[in-house]
């Protein structure tokens, strides 16, 4: 794993008593993958997560990202915004392939893109993120087998890569501002920092 990859790989692994297994919690800008019978969990507002797995081997993972605002047309593959989204997707897919997944067996479930953050662009941030992840997977010929995108509610997503099961809990009321603060901090970091290095997919 390169230094660049390590910077984005989630390190918050704990034992989840509810589901009786190890779990990895991913934050905005992070991703996690595993071949073990684990749980990967995240909370999404405007960000999106792609849960991608090899349906034969059960090797799978999840990312959590948003497109930076102001990078031009998110649909243009050369915009800074699209390059960041592409990086977030490719770093996960590359690590899955390195871990033994086969490209032709990959399937995806995508979540998030809620209308939670405002003030970052004229178009809804969540909608842009949802549109990007759908388009990326279509271009890469990775089938989306389930999705829960857009809406106005944040979501807590529990992903079991070994069998592909996903549980989604809509958070109709937030008890605090942690999620919104986390996403706004992440959006600000994206604005001030440069897009991470290029990653190429291999098959």
UniProtKB/Swiss-Prot annotation:
Reactions this protein catalyses: L-glutaminyl-[protein] + H2O = L-glutamyl-[protein] + NH4(+)
Source domain of life: Bacteria
GO MF, one annotated term: protein-glutamine glutaminase activity
E.C. designation(s): 3.5.1.44
Keyword Hydrolase part of the UniProt annotation: yes
Single GO BP term: chemotaxis
InterPro entries named among the record's database cross-references: CheD-like_sf, Chemorcpt_Glu_NH3ase_CheD, Cytotoxic_necrot_fac-like_cat
Main EC class the enzyme belongs to: hydrolase
Keywords (A to Z) from UniProt: Chemotaxis, Hydrolase
Family annotation (Pfam families): CheD (PF03975)
Biological role: Probably deamidates glutamine residues to glutamate on methyl-accepting chemotaxis receptors (MCPs), playing an important role in chemotaxis.
Family listed: Belongs to the CheD family.
Protein name as catalogued: Probable chemoreceptor glutamine deamidase CheD
Originating species: Janthinobacterium sp. (strain Marseille)
